[in-house]
């Protein structure tokens, strides 16, 4: 039996404490997922920042990064179902992001960046 391939080791950054922890996690997730999915962030950084902030808030309060751009009768129930947890099913299946967080290269609002810094998220989301 051949040995299992080893996964590359990922250097973990020291995460900030308190409120910034979920924001740092969701920022890192966004940067990684944009690259993996070959999508781009909105050309207007405040759109990206506000969505990441909403995802971080939901992660902190609900335990899951529930899409912040939709209305829910019961957020806790929706978070448990997982359909609208980021990346949501429409994004995973069809590359359709209602929040404009992950945009295909041909989208008129897509910027050139697949990365945003934690500092820029804070700056553009008025934290």
Label each PLM-derived region with a short phrase:
Residues 1-14:
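N-terminal chloroplast transit peptides
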Residues 15-127:
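Long, distal/terminal scaffolding or interaction modules
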